[in-house]
Each structure stands twice: as C-alpha cells, then as structure tokens.
C-alpha cells in the first residue's frame, strides 16, 4: 500500500514538472480551463475545441494563457481567440478535418498582436484558387509571407493616395512654375466683394474667368495657312495683331503700294517703293493739269514717305491709319470681344495687387500679348485662379503666345535679310521740276526701278 502511494506521488510530481510555466491543474479553478467547457490544459498548451463563447474563458484566464492550441476552428473563430486573449504569444492551429480559408485576416490579426504560429511549416492552407491565388494549396509559411507583402503594398498605396489628397489644395501648394513659395494673395483678401477667379463681380452682368480667357484667345491669330497644309486655319478673314517686327526696308508684295507714278499717256502702273523713303513722285495718272497723279496731293504727284503737303499723301500715315482701322475692328467682332470699362478696372485692381503694370488699352491685341507675357512671369496670379481647367487654358494660351512671338522675331529677321539682298535701288524724292510742276514733264519715274541714284534732284526724262 505504501509503495502504491509512492508511485502516485512520483507521477503527480512528474506531471507538475512537465507543465513548466503554463497554468497547471491545481485546486484553483482559475488556473486552467475545464474540459467540460471545451478547453483544457494539454502539453503546455491550452487546448480548445469549442468556439470562444462556448468555452466560457474568463478575462482572468485569458490574461494568463500565453500558449494556445485550437482544434476544429474556422478562420473567424481563430481571429476571435487571438483578439480576446491579451497574454497570448504562441498559437498552434491543428487542422483535424477543418480547412482554413486563404484569407489574410488571420495573418493580420497575428501580426497586430505579435503572435507566432508555431506549426507554420506543417499547417496547410487549401482551396486558395477560389480566392484568386495562383496555387490551390500551400503551407502556412509562404502564405504568411505573401499576406505580409500584400499588406505592405496596400499601406504604401494608401500613404501615396493620402499625400496626393493633402497636396491638392491650390492655396497651400507652391507656385506651379517657380516652385518657391505658396501664393501670397488670395482672391478673398484682394476684394471683399463677390469674386469669380480673375474678375471681381458686384453687378448683375457677370464676367467669369472663362469670358476673360475667351476674350484673350479670340484676338490671338491662328497658325498661318500654307499652300501645302489645308488643315491649318486661314486667318485672312480675321484681324491679325500688329507686327512687332515691322518691315522698315523694302516692302514685300503684300505691303501697301506707295506713289504710283507712270509715263504720260500710259495706263497707271504700280511701283513699289520703300515704306520710309517715298515712292515715285511727279506726273502720274493721265497727265493732270498740274501733274496730279493717281495718289496726287493738292499740287504735285503722288508723294512717298517723305512727301509733305506738297508731294501728296504720306505713305507711313496711310499704313498706320490702315493698321489702326484694322485693330479698331476688334471691339465689334461678334459683339462679344469688347471688355467693359468696369471689368477692365477690376482686372487692373487684381493685377495691381500682384504688382503687374497693366497696359492702358487692353482691347489692343499688341497689349494683350504684353499682358500674357506679364502673366507668364507672375505665376502667383495663375495660382489664384480657382478653376483648374481655366488655369490650364490660360497657361496654354501664354505658352502659345510666346512661341508665336519667337516665330515673329525669327521671321522678321529673315525677311529683312532677304529684302536687303533683293531690294531695288532707292527711289529719290523725284525731280523737283516734276514734283512741283506737272507741266515741265518731269517726275515720271524719279530714277526708280532698276537701281537709279537716290536723291537725284531734278532729272527730267522725256
């Protein structure tokens, strides 16, 4: 009898030693869950085969169990055990006929609590193709690696998306072209009235930024048409802006003809003359009584650029007057291109806040080009345009305007060089006898045409 008692005591001692640090079976009911509730202590693990609610694990027991083995539990119950047991550090998931789904929720729950899956090399995950995986069956180790990689990628995408949303505020980001400082002025600070992007509005008549943009783009010429490209729109019907690089040497065939002298008794002929020097002077037309030509003045024949009240109409004056008449048509094209004085004043006020000098006549297409250049070098004004689409349109218009100005400069230089190479001889002032007296028979060609002597005074031909 004594020997049997000794064996029982030794067995109890060995069982206690095998329990190590895990809560062992003792007389205290809180040390280990009871088997009749679906959990018990087994090989240093708390082994549970019921759901978390059915096992009736108290918070006190859950805060003491650090190693857990689950049997017959689907993914949802495994996640519940992990999240409810605060002291858990290791977990073993036994299949025992229960197949875990290929869902990364289980991996995310373990990573959030810092729990290790001790049997990840033996546990198999099946039916993964139904969840979009490339393989149908895999062990838990590669499954954990893939889920963690997916989570890192999702976090990176979320951070980039949040950063893009935070940086999309136009009032906070730096100038789109200079990139130095955020826009200093806001429209609401510039004008306490009702504002709409570029123009402040306190009247019944509205002038939004799109109208201002359409006004600018309506005066800008389209690309010049060529004989080989029919897709390029022709701007001959529209009023082109003034040339910044005028042809001050010899005119091209499209320039305004000056002078117009001819031999007596012959039909009138067109003689092109330098714009600034005056054309053939003297007897013209059909031989008038006092030598008045086709463009004759009060006394003499058709005067050139230097001809005064005696020599006839001034060539440059006619050319400038013609250009000004063309520019004045802008205010009546379609009835929508003229900006009212009030709106112009609003634009001046807005541009004045950004220290931009606005030209006096905004309806002049040449000054519109200056305004576009001002806008291009003052990006803060662009940042104040609230509508991204309108802001992009204005920026595109400025870029195209600058390209056309560069083309004008290149074309002007090239035309002047060609004119100097191919120019005829300079026309003189005409014979003094012919220019002043039609009856003397002078002033018929003025040594024009084949390179005669300039300023040849008083030669009378014929």
Swiss-Prot record:
Q: What is this protein called?
A: Bindin
Task of the protein = Species-specific sea urchin sperm protein required for adhesion of sperm to the egg surface during fertilization. Bindin coats the acrosomal process after it is externalized by the acrosome reaction. It binds to sulfated, fucose-containing polysaccharides on the vitelline layer receptor proteoglycans which cover the egg plasma membrane.
Alphabetically sorted, this entry's keywords are: Cell adhesion, Cleavage on pair of basic residues, Cytoplasmic vesicle, Fertilization, Signal
Task: Return any one Pfam family short name.
Answer: Bindin
Region Fucose-binding domain: start-end pairs: 372-380
Give GO BP annotations, semicolon-separated: cell adhesion; fusion of sperm to egg plasma membrane involved in single fertilization
Q: Where in the cell is it found?
A: Cytoplasmic vesicle, Secretory vesicle, Acrosome lumen
């Amino acid at each position: 009898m004594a020997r049997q008692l000794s064996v029982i005591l030794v067995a109890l001692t060995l069982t206690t030693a095998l329990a190590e640090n895990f809560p062992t079976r003792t007389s205290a009911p809180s040390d280990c869950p009871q088997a009749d509730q679906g959990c018990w202590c087994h090989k240093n693990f708390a082994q549970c085969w019921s759901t978390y609610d059915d096992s009736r694990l108290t918070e006190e027991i859950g805060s003491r169990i650090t190693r857990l083995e689950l049997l017959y539990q689907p993914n949802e119950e495994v996640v519940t055990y992990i999240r409810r047991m605060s002291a858990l550090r290791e977990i073993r998931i036994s299949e025992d006929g229960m197949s875990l789904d290929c869902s990364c929720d289980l991996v995310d729950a373990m990573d959030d609590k810092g729990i290790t899956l001790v049997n990840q090399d033996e546990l198999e995950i099946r039916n993964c193709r139904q969840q979009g995986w490339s393989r149908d069956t895999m062990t838990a180790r590669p499954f954990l690696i893939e889920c963690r990689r997916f989570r890192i990628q999702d976090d990176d995408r979320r951070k980039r998306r949040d950063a893009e949303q935070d940086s999309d505020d136009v009032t906070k980001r730096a100038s789109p072209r200079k990139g130095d400082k955020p826009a200093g002025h806001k429209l609401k600070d510039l004008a306490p009235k009702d504002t709409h992007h570029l123009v402040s509005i306190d009247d019944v008549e509205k002038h939004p930024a799109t109208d201002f943009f359409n006004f600018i783009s309506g005066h800008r010429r389209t690309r010049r048409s060529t004989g080989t490209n029919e897709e390029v729109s022709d701007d001959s019907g529209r009023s082109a802006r003034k040339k910044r690089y005028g042809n001050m040497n010899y005119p091209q065939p499209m320039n305004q003809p000056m002078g117009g002298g001819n031999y007596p008794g012959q039909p009138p002929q067109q003689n092109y003359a330098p714009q600034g020097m005056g054309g053939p002077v003297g007897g013209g037309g059909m031989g008038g009584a006092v030598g008045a030509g086709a463009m004759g003045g009060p006394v003499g024949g058709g005067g050139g650029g230097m001809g005064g009240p005696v020599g006839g109409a001034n060539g440059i004056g006619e050319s400038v007057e013609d250009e000004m008449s063309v520019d004045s048509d802008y205010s009546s094209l379609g009835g929508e291109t003229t900006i009212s004085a009030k709106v112009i004043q609003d634009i001046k006020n807005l541009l004045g806040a950004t220290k931009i000098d606005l030209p006096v006549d905004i309806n002049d297409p040449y000054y519109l080009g200056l305004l576009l250049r001002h806008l291009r070098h003052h990006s803060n004004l662009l940042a104040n345009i609230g509508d991204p689409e309108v802001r992009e349109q204005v920026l595109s218009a400025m870029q195209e305007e600058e390209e056309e100005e560069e083309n004008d400069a290149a074309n002007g230089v090239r035309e002047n060089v060609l004119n100097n190479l191919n120019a005829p001889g300079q026309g003189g002032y005409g014979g003094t006898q012919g220019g002043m007296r039609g009856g003397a028979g002078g002033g018929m060609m003025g040594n024009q045409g084949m390179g005669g002597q300039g300023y040849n005074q008083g030669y009378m031909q014929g």
